[in-house]
Amino acid sequence: TQAGIKEIVFIISKKKEIIKKYFYNDAFYKRIIKKKKDLRIAQEYKKIKKYKKMIKFVYQNNPKGTGDAVLKTKKIIKDKFFLVLLPDDLIIKKNCSKAMISIHNKKKCSVMASMKVNKKTVNRWGIFSKKKNINKNNFYIDDVVEKPNIKSAPSNDAVIGRYILPKKIFTKLKNQKKGKGGEIHITDSIRELINDGEKFIAHNFDGKYLDCGTMKGYIKSSIEINKK
């Protein structure tokens, strides 16, 4: 909400109903608050009641990739541009989404969060090449490739899980062929849009990146967040 977001859509599977229950299990929260009289839980419940008015859920029951997950929201998204956040990629200490929205409002185009990664790990990321520098932290993107091999990667500049995308990407995703691992990759559709002349900006964010995509990374991230 600090970034000005007014509607949130969670894309979950039937196995992840616990996320939905977190927002809608009023009886549980009221029981715990009454029993423990914990002010922190009461404050958290107050936040949840506020946010759940903004939230919708859609289901991706078969894991067919990030692109397929985003496509599930097609009927809900009404604006020309929308923000996508991947839960495996956390950015703390600075509000990356707010910074990206500010850039989008100025440049009127798509924006993606980015950072330098170890050259030996480029095959884990969407990797892009720069077309033109805007300033030291923002660049127009020339091309982007999903998980390239180390030798053919255009750089070690990686896209991190924050995207401001145009609504027209849904047409690309609908017709997108399966990519690596048999999944629909959002990077492939972004690449097609760039080839069509759509402008994309990479934003090197100021916050701290936490990788929650592995159990080891999740544990480290939990420790880091609990330091606050």
What residue ranges belong to the model's regions?
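Catalytic-core segments of class I nucleotidyltransferases/pyrophosphorylases
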Residues: 83, 97, 101, 105, ...
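Conserved beta-loop-beta/alpha segment of the NTase-like Rossmann-fold superfamily
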Residues: 19, 29-32, 41-131, 174-176
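Short internal beta-strands
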Residues: 9-13, 113-114
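Phosphate- and divalent-cation-binding pockets in alpha/beta enzyme and binding domains
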Residues: 18-19, 68, 189, 220
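A short, N-terminal amphipathic alpha-helix
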Residues: 1-10
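Conserved N-terminal/central alpha/beta ligand/cofactor-binding core
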Residues: 24-25
